[in-house]
UniProtKB/Swiss-Prot annotation:
It comes from Psychrobacter cryohalolentis (strain ATCC BAA-1226 / DSM 17306 / VKM B-2378 / K5). Belongs to the MinE family. Keywords: Cell cycle, Cell division. It comes from the Bacteria. Prevents the cell division inhibition by proteins MinC and MinD at internal division sites while permitting inhibition at polar sites. This ensures cell division at the proper site by restricting the formation of a division septum at the midpoint of the long axis of the cell. NCBIfam families: minE, PRK00296.1. InterPro entries: MinE, MinE_sf. This is Cell division topological specificity factor. One of its GO terms (biological process) is regulation of division septum assembly. HAMAP family: MinE. The gene is minE. Gene3D superfamilies: Cell division topological specificity factor MinE (3.30.1070.10).
Amino acid sequence: MSKKKGFWSSLFGTDDSNAGSANMATERLKVIVASENRLNNRLTADRIEKMKREILEVVNKYVNGVQIDDVNINHRSEDSLDVLEMNINLPEHKK
């Protein structure tokens, strides 16, 4: 019987086909959110910290061992576009 891989399974290597891949566990999850509106007014330091905690809760539902220091969020402007970049360092996958 063939199994369809779910999004989270393929991303975090939770199915049998990815179980042997040590590199999968050390890769970063990168998410870039871009908005034509200015983010400065909406994203204060407090809101970014709250966002980090909420993201950490969701990630830890699928990958154990991610700490708040493993979540990095950066805001920068490029021309008329604001970019919010998030990097999450995942712990090593143990066999």
